[in-house]
């Protein structure tokens, strides 16, 4: 049997061989995709975030991590994004993928990430190590003509003195990366969003520098980016904290209605976009689920945002074989928009909700306790504790980023 070695991929490794492995797993890359992959792969290798499996010195599998923050009720939490996980076709079925992911989970924990997320090509391997379905990307579609006239704000809701305000819109590029990240972050905090990501300035500037991306800043609180996808328009993201700014940005996108028939993009299920169009012809055409892993339960709870009006307390019992530090008897407390998870001295509570790592991930993401129990991801607890946990963790997680 061929010996398989798991080790970090270094800047001195053969990247042509790594590219070949990726294309055997995911298909042929375009010239732009290949250049982007190579740039990111070398960057992650330099950070020690690119892990490889080698059989007799030949690449047999690989995976990489992205350093990100994920917003939970408006609070950014450090997150390791797992990406580009693959095993060479001739080496599949030998446990290489599981060995690779086990070592990757150890690296994530050693680097101090409370959370990890990924888009699964298949779920069993990730579930076996504690990841669970948590949220989704939602693809919207709308006829471009339907964007020509946006619904005016409801005067009854605006109050006396509210009137139209023109918001200046200007082009944005890599030099504006700090302003763009500020606007995106402020937008997520104001909306108390759950699930969306933010990147460091380096990868964000690279994205803003794409030749096929058209991005705009509006006033001091808005940002939008879109690109052409064949004859259609693809909206990468739209952020705003005022109705005027939101309409100014969508008006830029709507100005293409004479040159395209269709507009699509990733969106949130509660994006204000759904309430802006005159007709109900915008629709979700595709939903892609992503998975979450709570790597450090206490740190993840401490970093997460919670509803400010909710006060709750509940005992939990966690069993996490892959991350034993999460295992034990805990007391969850939520108040004033913050949460704590503290050991209760090892004393079991007959009222405790019992969870494995998959149940912890799903609960963290706002899945109702009744759903967890019916899915076999939780047991025990009490009706009062269920209601308190549902109120504390209530969220509708989404992403708009690929990684």
Predicted feature residues:
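Short acidic/polar capping segments at secondary-structure boundaries
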Residues: 122-125, 131, 146-147, 174-177
């Amino acid at each position: 049997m061929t010996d398989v070695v798991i080790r970090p991929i270094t800047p001195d490794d053969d990247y042509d061989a790594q590219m070949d492995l990726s294309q055997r797993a995911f298909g042929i890359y375009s010239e732009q995709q290949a250049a982007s992959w190579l740039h990111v792969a070398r960057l992650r290798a330099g950070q020690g975030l690119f892990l490889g499996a080698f059989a007799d010195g030949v690449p047999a599998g690989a995976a990489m991590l992205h350093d990100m923050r994920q917003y939970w009720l408006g609070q950014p939490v450090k997150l390791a994004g797992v990406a580009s996980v693959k095993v060479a076709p001739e080496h599949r079925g030998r446990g290489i993928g599981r060995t690779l992911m086990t070592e990757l989970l150890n690296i994530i924990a050693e680097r101090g990430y409370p959370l990890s997320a990924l888009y699964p090509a298949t779920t069993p391997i990730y579930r076996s190590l504690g990841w669970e379905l948590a949220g989704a990307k939602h693809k919207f579609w709308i006829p471009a003509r339907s964007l020509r006239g946006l619904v005016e704000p409801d005067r009854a809701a605006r109050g006396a003195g509210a009137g139209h305000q023109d918001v200046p819109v200007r082009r944005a590029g890599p030099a504006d990366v700090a302003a763009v990240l500020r606007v995106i972050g402020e937008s997520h905090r104001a909306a108390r969003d759950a699930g969306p990501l933010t990147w460091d300035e380096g990868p964000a500037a690279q994205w803003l520098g794409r030749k096929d991306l058209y991005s705009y800043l509006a006033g001091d609180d808005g940002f939008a980016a879109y690109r052409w996808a064949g004859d259609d328009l693809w909206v990468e993201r739209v952020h705003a904290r005022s109705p005027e700014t939101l309409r100014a940005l969508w008006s830029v996108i709507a100005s293409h209605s004479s040159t395209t028939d269709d507009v699509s993009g990733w969106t949130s299920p509660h994006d204000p976009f759904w309430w802006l169009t005159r007709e109900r012809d915008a629709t979700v055409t595709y939903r892609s689920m992503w998975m979450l892993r709570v790597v450090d339960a206490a740190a993840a709870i401490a970093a997460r945002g919670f509803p400010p009006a909710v006060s709750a307390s509940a005992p939990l019992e966690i069993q996490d074989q892959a991350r034993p530090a999460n295992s034990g008897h805990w007391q969850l407390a939520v108040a004033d928009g913050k949460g704590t998870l503290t050991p209760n001295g090892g004393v079991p509570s007959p009222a405790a909700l019992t969870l494995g790592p998959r149940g912890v991930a799903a609960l963290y993401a706002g899945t109702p306790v009744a759903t967890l129990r019916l899915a076999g991801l939780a047991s025990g607890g009490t009706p009062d504790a269920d209601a308190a946990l549902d109120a504390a963790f209530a969220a509708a997680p989404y992403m708009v980023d690929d990684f």
